[in-house]
Amino acid sequence: MLSTLIKKMFGSRNERTLRRMEKSVMAINAFEPKMQALSNEELAGKTQEFKERFNNGESLDELLAEAFATVREVSLRTLGLRHFDVQLIGGMVLHEGNIAEMRTGEGKTLVATLPAYLNAISGRGVHIVTVNDYLAKRDSQWMRPIYEFLGLTVGVIYPDMSHKEKQEAYKADIVYGTNNEYGFDYLRDNMAFSLTDKVQRELNFAIVDEVDSILIDEARTPLIISGAAEDSSELYIKINSLIPQLKKQEEEGDEGDYTVDEKQKQAHLTDAGHLHIEELLTKAKLLDPGESLYHASNIMLMHHVNAALKAHAMFHRDIDYIVKDNQVVIVDEHTGRTMPGRRWSEGLHQAVEAKEGVPIQNENQTLASITFQNFFRMYNKLSGMTGTADTEAYEFQQIYNLEVVVIPTNRSMIRKDEADLVYLTQADKFQAIIEDVRECGVRRQPVLVGTVSIEASEFLSQLLKKENIKHQVLNAKFHEKEAQIIAEAGRPGAVTIATNMAGRGTDIVLGGSLAADLANLPADASEQEKEAVKKEWQKRHDEVIAAGGLRIIGSERHESRRIDNQLRGRAGRQGDPGSSRFYLSLEDNLMRIFASERVASMMRRLGMQPGEPIEHSLVTRAIENAQRKLEGHHFDVRKQLLDYDNVANDQRQVIYTQRSSIMAMTDTQEVVEMMREEVMDSLVDTYIPPQSLEDQWDPQALSDVLSDEFKIKAPVPDWIDKDHSIQPEQIKEKILALAIEHYDEKVRKVGRPVISQFEKSIILQTLDNHWREHLAAMDQLRQGIHLRGYAQKDPKQEYKKEAFSLFTMMLDNLKYEVIRILSSVEIQTEEDAQVVEEQRRADQIRKMNLMHESLSENDEASETQTFRRQEKKIGRNDPCPCGSGKKYKACHGSLV
């Protein structure tokens, strides 16, 4: 009540922001006549003038009006495009580090040039983030004339660039690239061997296009760089053959071996299922008779069973993935694109490969990872733009501290959004869609039919073929033809079926794409030929407008209202006419899981018959409530991911900062000396505990460890025999002196510069190995930490405590290992040090898998180099080589 009253008196926050910015628009417009009067040389010279004024103390905010006016005039002269007033407001929103919600067709690509130019004046760089490589290349080429006219350099990054090309690209004032590529480059930079190997500079200012897709839809899955772990293909194949023998429990209380939770996308074994799978595993000789699957020694077996169960119960061909060229290729649920190279982790991808009978690729070991949430929050300033952000404004504010400002359209939006029609069955729904498409065809109105899966798009395509309705299919299987299909989607009578339109990044122009038509002309085409093409396009354009503009048909509601709005937003661009309607059925996933009972009872009360639709605001509200519930659930998942990743992020920052400082050092002597002192102190404390009696000391064991591990001859028992009053601190001093003397001998042999090079290589190599193992330990901790809730403990607090303990242990082990190697390895020449460095590089420069929910179509993961053991592999049921008499899996094998 009070908030409504305040809004009436003062306007909403959005209205107040727009009013404030309108004053700045007036100031920019006041500069326009001055800019028009300047020659090209004078206009280009403005950049140098702005840089000097900035260096002399003027802020970017003070330069904004004149800089924006400069960009607008240059854009008009180079591209023939003049920024509208609403685009200037969008540019200001981005410059202030917020999100501009701008409808489809309002020129977001052009808007980005304003804040990009202004912030590039500081010389600290600007990153413009797109959802795929095609858009990064297209937008950088399209906007390049503006930047280059003004004396700025433009770079574009994409996966198959050479290291040198990428370094050059990042040096540019303004860089275009995908979210994945920026993130992976950051991780790769923190696995680099020297500062000169790094490609990125400071993360200064990012402008994220389709910000909702990148910062929300893709936030649940981290970016991961991984290498191949051990081959266990046979185990996947054996377990895969057992899963079809399990029976699904349809209803609670029914018999069955496993249950499926579609909301959480999980499959769980029932009590009967546990017994059944143990029986099957025993028959397959994977489990000893009478042994439990839950025994500590069978953790890996349980992991394989869970992965196989999930692969069979939850992941479906042509919905979650496709099989292409004998490989399982994931389909991104948000964009409908295939993701070559992206792989599910936790052994799930291998389980799906076993299910489909394609070659099984090795499991992956995480080498480095980060979430987009933590990556983008590292930028000094972050902003974004999209057509649909307002529904997620709370999440943007909570997680990224970004305000959403809804920018008014340049022309009034006249698209007609019709109420949803709900049918009892999918068959009725699809029949109604066919009728709607046919009616549009009669009046030559172009239609875009949106589906949520490849399966649905292909099913609909089959129905249209039966009715002899010509159409194009745009889904993950045919994205190579994407630009061509989109260019023709606005032609009179065109019918296009498209899986999720999020992130397509190309406008559907009524009448078809004039630019595409002109591009098809020969290079030496005359002006008359060009005019003829333009006239033909204008005729088609007018015909489509007369038919009602683009018709949008949604074949199913998405889990997120925002994705539905993105589909609708394809029509009605820049004041064009258009219409949209969603056709639903009670058999649709969203309705079936969340809203079917309520809507079904409503339909029964209204006496609905098969084939008849219901169109009612109550139904629409019930559907939107279901979507809100799901959006809330996904927000909680993302928030929880962030809470856990924040712990790992603090550790990541420490490691990466330390790594960079070590790479920057020319002399590592001080670091090694500090490590040596800590390691020797800790070693003495282990065998001669502080505040302990002499009877509790174990001087011989201490001497043995020093000799065996560090090649230091320290007769500790003799020291104690000669001086019974000797204190632990004195022993520490003696041991440290011997350790220094032992190491100084090595330094004298080869010289300090060679030793420093060797030290740096060993520290970085050991750090990388221990960090990799630590990431695996953190993953395992994360997997089981929720069980602490059953013991009335807060899992997040427990995770923080245990993660800190693991991190401390990792650092201690790291120091111990570095000093052990440095003390025990003999270095004869400078070549020896270089060999170690080359081995380290070879070890890490194996080709890595890059994994994320939305790798673009070009991001193909390379093959990984697999380690082959020389000796025979120890079987799980073989005697443990340690001599304990136990089976390997119950002894040292339980740690593997």
Curated annotation (Swiss-Prot):
Keywords: ATP-binding, Cell inner membrane, Cell membrane, Cytoplasm, Membrane, Metal-binding, Nucleotide-binding, Protein transport, Translocase, Translocation, Transport, Zinc. This is Protein translocase subunit SecA. GO terms for molecular function: ATP binding; metal ion binding; protein-exporting ATPase activity. GO terms for cellular component: cell envelope Sec protein transport complex; cytosol; plasma membrane. Its EC number is 7.4.2.8. Part of the Sec protein translocase complex. Interacts with the SecYEG preprotein conducting channel. Has a central role in coupling the hydrolysis of ATP to the transfer of proteins into and across the cell membrane, serving both as a receptor for the preprotein-SecB complex and as an ATP-driven molecular motor driving the stepwise translocation of polypeptide chains across the membrane. ATP binds at residues 87, 105-109, 507. GO terms for biological process: intracellular protein transmembrane transport; protein import; protein targeting; protein transport by the Sec complex. Residues 853-879 are annotated as: Disordered. SMART domains: SecA_DEAD (SM00957), SecA_PP_bind (SM00958). Belongs to the SecA family. Its cofactor is Zn(2+). Zn(2+) binds at residues 880, 882, 891-892. It is found in: Cell inner membrane; Cytoplasm. The gene is secA. Disulfide bonds: none annotated. InterPro entries: Helicase_ATP-bd, Helicase_C-like, P-loop_NTPase, SEC_C_motif, SecA, SecA_CS, SecA_DEAD, SecA_motor_DEAD. May bind 1 zinc ion per subunit. It is a peripheral membrane protein. Residues 866-876 have a biased composition (Basic and acidic residues).
